[in-house]
Amino acid sequence: MKKKVLALVLCLALVTALVIGLVACNGDEKRVVDLKPIAKEDIKIGLICLHDEQSTYDKNFIDAMDEAVKDLGLREDQLIKKTGIPETEKCYDTAIDLVEQGCNIIFADSFGHEDYIMRAAYECPDVRFFHATGTKAHTEKYGNYFNAFASIYEGRYLAGVAAGLKLVETYGDSEG
């Protein structure tokens, strides 16, 4: 009798867990976020960089952001740059700090920042978060989290062609 009761309880627990799991795994739906247009004078951008401008990678983002702000006719005080932000919890803290300073658009430039930026995006649905080199925006389906990643296959192809030409130059045999 005890075995039957135990088996019944376990079956009920399993079915309950299965139903809860199926209901909770509604991953095909995008999280509904109502992002309203931002008036030009209300735009405030935060930029989170792994290193400072001494790193050519980060300098590229810093210079591009400065140029974008200028081209859009935004004021200098509409951009806050945070450099030297490691791929740790400090990235999340920095993103939240930027939100608290009024930033409504936040960019991060390091692959390792992604999980921290996603967490901030989840907690701050009214702020737009952009992550360079990220890969999870299309799978996580946050309405306010976006990835920016170039199609780099062209560059890889050209690098391969250049390497092949160098081999021919060095060894003189294009036929292998």
Where are each of the predicted segments found?
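An alpha-beta-alpha
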Residues: 65, 156-176
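Short, well-structured alpha-helical segments in soluble
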Residues: 88-103
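Positively charged n-region of N-terminal signal peptides that target proteins for export
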Residues: 1-10
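Periplasmic-binding protein-like
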Residues: 47-48, 100-111, 128-132
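Flexible loop/hinge segments that line or gate small-molecule binding clefts
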Residues: 122-149
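Extracytoplasmic "Venus flytrap"
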Residues: 31-40, 44-64, 68-69, 81-91, ...
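C-terminal motif of bacterial Sec signal peptides marking the signal peptidase cleavage site
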Residues: 21-24
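Bacterial signal peptide processing site
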Residues: 26-28
